[in-house]
Curated annotation (Swiss-Prot):
Keyword Transmembrane: yes
Gene Ontology annotations for the cellular component aspect, listed alphabetically: membrane
Subcellular localization(s) per the UniProt record: Membrane
Name the record gives this protein: Transmembrane protein 170 homolog
Topology of this chain in the membrane: Multi-pass membrane protein
Lineage: Eukaryota, Amoebozoa, Evosea, Eumycetozoa, Dictyostelia
Length: 128
């Protein structure tokens, strides 16, 4: 398998439900699985925080749009943060000739999202 082919993610995993079974062994597929789950969890958590903010600021004329903007922001953060972290994890898995099973991809993506959310939402408490 040429190196260039291993960098192209096989997007069939997103469309035929293969993110829920099987193993990933190519660089692009591992990256796609981890980035996808990190983005999903981050987007959902930012959407929930947007609904909370919209409820708290319900007298504002922009309050109905807050969840939309926070979800878009969460998606951008999930893609960037998850993409960079998944790049490193993919390199480790490919260079070590390991297989990434479907549930390990979910665990890595959700774990990365939780680490980011802990740092994002406890930022004021962690400052010295």
């Amino acid at each position: 398998m040429p190196f260039r082919d291993s960098l192209q993610p096989d997007t069939r995993y997103l469309t035929d439900g293969s993110l829920f079974h099987g193993y990933f062994y190519q660089y692009g597929d591992i990256w796609l699985a981890i980035t996808f789950w990190c983005t999903v969890v981050t987007t959902i958590s930012y959407l929930i925080s947007g609904f909370v903010a919209s409820f708290v600021l319900k007298k504002s004329k922009f309050s109905p749009f807050i969840p939309i903007f926070t979800a878009m922001y969460g998606m951008a953060i999930g893609i960037c943060y998850g993409g960079i972290s998944a790049l490193i994890l993919s390199a480790i898995y490919v260079s070590g000739s390991f297989l990434l099973s479907w549930y390990q991809g979910i665990i890595c993506g959700v774990g990365l999202a939780i680490v980011h959310l802990l740092f994002a939402f406890t930022q004021g408490k962690l400052q010295v």
